[in-house]
């Protein structure tokens, strides 16, 4: 149900033209859940470049303005590559519930990327629910995350 969801801060949304329609479907889902979001664009199906779309949304997560990011492109892969270049972002590209759950539990992912040409709106909304509701387990995973983040400082 609805009660599971409580975000201290808004969710950052961003997409290129290939992910625009899926972003809009997820946005409607967040509204149904009563969750706040900031839509960093794009706002149409006109062609834009996914790195340009990823950066402002991811910066909002890293700065603490937003809780997590939901990012969309044609496959989810390009925008995940862009997101993972941003210091402090741990982006996953998911199209199945198991990966989506465990990337939160074990990797403390803070950006979920999906492909508008890969994932339908129903599955996308399910994955968003899993992503937003699953807590990081910590424990043995803490040192692995620390090692992952240390790569950014080489």
Which ranges hold each PLM region?
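C-terminal binding/interaction regions
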Residues: 12-14, 18-19, 97-154
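Short, Lys/Arg-enriched N-terminal segments with co-localized hydrophobic residues
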Residues: 1-6
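Solvent-exposed alpha-helices and their adjacent loops that cap or buttress functional pockets
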Residues: 7, 61-65, 104-106
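Mid-chain, well-packed structural core segment of small domains
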Residues: 71-117
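A short beta-strand-loop structural module common to alpha/beta enzyme folds
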Residues: 36-47
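Glycine-rich phosphate/diphosphate-binding loop of Rossmann-like nucleotide-binding domains
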Residues: 12-32
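Short active-site oxyanion
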Residues: 10-11, 66-69, 88-90
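Short, structured active-site "lid" loops
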Residues: 53-71, 75
């Amino acid at each position: 149900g609805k009660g599971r969801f409580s975000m201290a801060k808004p969710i950052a949304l961003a997409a290129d033209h290939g992910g625009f329609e899926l972003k809009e479907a997820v946005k409607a889902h967040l509204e149904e859940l009563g969750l706040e979001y900031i839509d960093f664009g794009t706002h149409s199906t006109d062609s834009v470049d996914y790195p340009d779309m990823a950066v402002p949304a991811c910066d909002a997560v890293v700065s603490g303005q937003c809780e997590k990011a939901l990012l969309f492109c044609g496959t989810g892969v390009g925008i995940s590559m862009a997101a993972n270049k941003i210091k402090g972002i741990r982006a996953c590209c998911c199209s199945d519930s198991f990966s989506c759950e465990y990337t939160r539990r074990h990797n403390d992912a803070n950006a979920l990327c999906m492909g508008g040409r890969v994932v339908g709106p129903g599955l996308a909304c399910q994955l968003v629910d899993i992503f937003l509701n699953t807590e990081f387990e910590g424990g043995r995973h803490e040192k692995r995350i620390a090692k992952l983040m240390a790569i950014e400082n080489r």
